[in-house]
């Protein structure tokens, strides 16, 4: 029997746990600085690190992918450029992110966080689908709340050395096709898309629906108001009101429907850990009850 509930984890989940994996921390890290210095004499038209640094005001991981896309667009106006050099820089960017995340301290977990509470709930229900857009290894957390086998990592993991970085499918110079996530050998979107469309309840925790991940979610919001859609409720857990506004903006871009139309088709709620943490805990406790009931149904013998 297919699980009726799907959980999507984004970088906000890691941050809520207390893991220092923010995009800003990466840009300020010695790993990024090292490669910035290595390419300091590289011409502007092929200096990917310098381009990303100049656009660092975007403070989510969607920022690096947005910068890569903008860089690809920028090169369209250049007749000749060293794309082999750009690919070399891109691979070093992947290396820098991997090194930065390898140094994350898993011992400073906030055990009172909503994210930790959610892990405790999910541990009880093996029938729940869990997808993570993070590279981090939850199995390294104290107490091993969830084995990695329970989580499908959309962008790969550091442990498996198959991390995916890049942009959504779009028209860019053919020589820069290595920027596209779909060109990665470990790219997997089919399972996530099919699972989302079959789910009755979906929880996005710390994922802003950033446009760099639009390939994964366009189908969800395109089909959400169709008669055959299974989706009944979608919850989003974000940090604050600013994150909520960004979320709504991204949903508007992804969907053929207005937010009002979507809310006529499904129950859609946004919870903010910074503004009203009590409401987040209440939602998760109700989710716990819902999963308990669905687990009983899931395990019922046939006949």
Model regions and ranges:
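Conserved catalytic-core helix/loop/strand module for nucleotide-ribose chemistry
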Residues: 2-6, 11-201, 207-303
């Amino acid at each position: 029997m297919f699980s009726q509930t799907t959980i999507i984890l984004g970088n906000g989940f890691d941050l809520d746990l207390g893991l220092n994996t923010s995009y800003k921390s990466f840009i300020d890290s010695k790993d990024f600085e090292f490669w910035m210095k290595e390419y300091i004499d590289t011409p502007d038209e092929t200096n990917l690190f310098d381009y990303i640094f100049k656009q660092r005001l975007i403070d989510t991981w969607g920022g690096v992918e947005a910068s890569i896309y903008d860089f690809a667009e920028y090169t369209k106006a250049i007749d000749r450029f060293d794309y082999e050099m750009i690919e070399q820089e891109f691979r070093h960017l992947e290396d820098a992110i991997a090194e930065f995340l390898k140094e994350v301290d898993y011992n400073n977990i906030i055990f009172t966080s909503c994210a930790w509470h959610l892990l405790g709930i999910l541990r009880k229900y093996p029938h729940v689908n869990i997808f993570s857009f993070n590279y981090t290894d939850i199995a390294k957390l104290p107490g091993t709340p969830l084995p990695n086998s329970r989580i499908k990592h959309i962008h790969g993991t550091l442990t498996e050395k198959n991390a995916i970085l890049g942009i959504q499918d779009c028209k860019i110079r053919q020589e820069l096709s290595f920027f596209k996530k779909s060109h990665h050998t470990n790219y997997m979107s089919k399972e996530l898309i099919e699972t989302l469309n079959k789910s009755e309840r979906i929880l996005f925790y710390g994922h802003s629906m950033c446009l760099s991940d639009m390939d994964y979610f366009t189908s969800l919001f395109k089909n959400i108001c169709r008669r055959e859609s299974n989706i009944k409720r979608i919850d989003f857990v974000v940090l604050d009101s600013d994150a909520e506004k960004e979320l709504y903006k991204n949903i508007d871009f992804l969907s053929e429907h207005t937010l009002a139309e979507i809310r006529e088709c499904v129950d859609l709620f946004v919870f903010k850990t910074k503004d009203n943490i009590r409401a987040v805990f209440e939602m998760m406790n109700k989710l716990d009850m819902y999963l308990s009931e669905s687990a009983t149904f899931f395990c019922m013998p046939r006949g």
